Amino acid sequence: MYYPEPISKLIDSFMKLPGIGPKTAVRLAFFVLNMKEDVVLDFAKALVNAKRNLTYCSSCGHITDKDPCYICEDDKRDRSIICVVQDPKDVIAMEKMKEYNGLYHVLHGAISPMEGIGPEDIKIAELLRRLQDETVQEVILATNPNIEGEATAMYISRLLKPTGVKITRIAHGLPVGGDLEYADEVTLSKALEGRREL
């Protein structure tokens, strides 16, 4: 189907987003065309502002507008515990329950041979460096309860065993195959309470 070039480019841009197929991209493009210009400009500014002003914390890998992030900078946090998660959205999910007071380490992915993602493609080396520098007594593996998350947790567990650090895994109150970011606070809280040593 023929669209004027500006609409085609907008549709193509929307299709670059995860979960957006051709039909949804067309629907979004026409929705944007019907929005007031000031709303569209605010939306565009928000996109540019986020891209320009957000970075990843050099310590934990969480998304932040200043380095180090507010969590790593907080002196009241328990620095003897690091919770390892796959994605910055998982940090936000954990923080919502307001029960965990340690630090985080964001892997930015999980081991997935089917997708060509190996241990060297995620932030495992950075985690090992942190364990050398900090007085960490426990590492909580809070990767997603799916095949990739489990494989990643087991890989990290084997790497960390010789260090003598206590290694725990969050309990499976979370649905297998689900993502941490979609879990409610009560489920996350129970999963954290029921973590087990590996």
UniProtKB/Swiss-Prot annotation:
GO molecular function: DNA binding; zinc ion binding
Gene3D superfamilies, alphabetized: 3.30.60.80, 3.40.1360.10, 6.10.250.240, RecR Domain 1
Claim: Ubl conjugation is one of the keywords in the record: no
UniProt-listed InterPro entries: DNA_Rcmb_RecR, Rcmb_RecR, Rcmb_RecR_Znf, TOPRIM_dom, TOPRIM_RecR
Zinc finger map (C4-type): 57-72
Keywords for the protein's UniProt record, in alphabetical order: DNA damage, DNA recombination, DNA repair, Metal-binding, Zinc, Zinc-finger
One GO biological process term: DNA recombination
A Pfam family recorded for this sequence: RecR_HhH
Highest taxon in the source lineage: Bacteria
Toprim domain boundaries: 80-175
NCBIfam families: recR
Function, in words: May play a role in DNA repair. It seems to be involved in an RecBC-independent recombinational process of DNA repair. It may act with RecF and RecO.
Family to which the UniProt record says this protein belongs: Belongs to the RecR family.
PANTHER family with a match to the protein in the record: RECOMBINATION PROTEIN RECR
Name this protein carries in UniProt: Recombination protein RecR
Organism the protein comes from: Anoxybacillus flavithermus (strain DSM 21510 / WK1)
Gene name per UniProt: recR
